[in-house]
């Protein structure tokens, strides 16, 4: 019996606190109920909202090993957003260790958004542009530029302007943003 307890303790220590579903892993870290809106398995990133109010949109990473999920609130990013004019459109461009450059965001609209096109234009050379087309699910998105071109959000906006357009199923522009 003692050997069995020792074996179980070693398994727990080696695997850490892992869960059968990502929802269970995230919920374990949050007091409020969360609603997962988008899971990107290739680079193990996720976007969710903070429960019944869906006010705060949160982006983070997770780990999946042996069919089990681990989630840490470090380095979580959460934002609330609104707009006085047009469709509220959140777009964030960040760099994460082990993942690289990431573009993520959300739109608050009843219109089904299917794609976001993001264009970065170099401030010193306007002909130098990087365009990223990102599929949208549940009006949220996670995308990755094909090449790494910044180290931090601060350095990005010192060198690049950002513009983005969100499109519906018919190809109509639902929202746009220029930063």
Regions found by a protein language model. Name each.
Residues 18-83, 159, 174-176:
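N-terminal export/targeting and maturation segments
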Residues 78-103:
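Extracellular ectodomain segments of secreted/surface proteins
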Residues 54-59, 99-102, 128-129, 160:
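Short, surface-exposed coil-to-beta transition loops
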Residues 108-114:
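Short proline/glycine-enriched turn/loop motifs at strand-loop junctions of beta-rich domains
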Residues 33-38, 90-95, 131:
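Short amphipathic beta-strand and strand-loop transition segments with alternating hydrophobic
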Residues 115-179:
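Ser/Thr-rich low-complexity repeats and stalk/linker segments
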Residues 101, 106-107, 118-123:
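Long, terminal "pre-/pro-" and other extracytoplasmic accessory regions
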Residues 1-15:
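Sec-dependent bacterial lipoprotein signal peptides
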